[in-house]
Structure formats: C-alpha cells, structure tokens
Amino acid sequence: ESGAGDDTVIGDNGNAEFNETAILTRIETTAPTIGGSDTISTGQGTDIVLGGYDTDTIHTYDTSNTSDSTENDSDKVIGDNGKVTFENDGSISVFATTNAGTGAKDEIYTGNGGDIIAGGDGDDEIYACVISSSSTCNGNDQSRDIVLGDNGQATFDTHGILRKFISSDYGHESTLEANAAYTDTIHTGGGDDIIIGGIQADIIESGAGDDTVIGDNGNAEFDIPSWLDIDVQLKTPSDGLFTSADEWSIAADGNLTVFTFNDILPAIHREMAQSIRD
C-alpha cells in the first residue's frame, strides 16, 4: 500500500531503469513464472502498476469512497507480466503485456482519469472508473480509457500520443487453442473509451461517451495526432475463429461503434455490427 502520490509498483519480480536526470525510461516484470497473489493499493496519483505472476487485486484509487469525483489521474496498469517504456522526457512510448500464458485472473480498479489497462491472462475484472456501492461505474469519469481484456500492446509517438492499439492474437486466430483466451468483465465510465475484449465471451459495459469496442481480437490505428479528436481506423480478423458471444451495455446518452463476430448485441447495435461485417 503506497498511498497518494505518483507511484511505480511491480507486484512480483521486475526491473526499473532511469536516465541521467532520474526520469523513468523503462519498467518491466522479470522471472514471469515466479511470484504470488498480490494486493496492491496506490491511492491517488498518476500510477504505474505491473501485477506480475498469479492472481492480483490492484487499486489505484481509494475504493472506499464510492462518490469520489476528484480522482482524475491517468494510471497505467498491467494485471500480469508486461513492460512500459518512456521517452527521455517521460512521455510514454510502449505499453505491452509480455510472457502470455504465465498470468492469472486479476481484479483491477483504476478510478477516474484517462487510464491504460491490460488485463493479461485469466478471467479478469476491470473497472476503469470509480465504482458505486452497487459495483457499477458512478458516472463521474469523463476521460478516455484504453482497455484490453487479454494480451496486447499500445504504441505511442514521441509526444506520448497513442498511435496503435492491438491485441496479441490479432492475425493469429488460426493457430490459437480454444483455451488460449479468457472471459473478461470490463466496465468503463464516461468519456470516449476504446476497448478490445480479446477472444472468448467477454462482458463489456461502457458508460456515456462515444465509445469504440472490438469484441474479440483487433487493431486500432490512430491517424490524427490529437488526444481530443482522433480518427480511428479499426481492423478485425475475418475468420472469427474461437470467438464467443459477448454481452454489451452502453449508457443511453452515449454512442457505440462495435466491431465484433457472433456477439450478443442490442438490436440497434447488432444491425450496425452486421453492416460493418458486410
């Protein structure tokens, strides 16, 4: 438990590198099959957390305050093994899971703010929002969250602006085993969120905002270098192998663009998804 402040935490084994001006340039897990079940609480602040091996519970805000609207930090969390690299000025460069198949189910709670999250292996529960007493998003989060249910990578330009977001299994569906992916539960609040569930039957609940969701594996490429106004080109594999029925929910005052295969959708979004397939 690290409390408030800008914290950097590795649950199990890892390595952190700093440049000559003491700016963090790389953090990564090591010894990916050695570790235990961790409970990590970092409180408010811009935090970086790599859970490492085994089943972890990660909080980057005070979950006892279910009405918190002041926590608005941009956290970066990987539930299992992974790495995050930075430019010499501290802007993020690469956010990626590593050593797929060595992790486990995690619970991740990041609160408000523009968070970047990758669940990794296992049937993860991810809340990119402040949760209410009923374990749903309280609606205060208006920032863009980037969430990946399974394994993958986010790549940024030299200014720390997101350029590409891809699941590790994208383009490799024909070689996957049926047990190679996991059933995740993902909740995001308001804001124009971007979510890739990964294969298997995920449950995805996005709040108000213009959200973009890929139910299974996918690749999102960002063409306009603006965090506030992004033109997204998304791709999904055409075969739909090892995909399962996902469940979706979206707030009434938000818009949803869905790229998915064989999924359970409300009628209006099912028609949209069918037109995309065609």
Regions found by a protein language model. Give the residues of each.
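Mobile, glycine-rich extracellular loop/lid and propeptide segments
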Residues: 12, 50-54, 60, 118-123, ...
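Extracellular repeat-rich scaffold modules on cell surfaces
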Residues: 42-44, 110-113, 187-193, 197-200
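Acidic/polar low-complexity surface segments
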Residues: 5-42, 48, 59-109, 127-185, ...
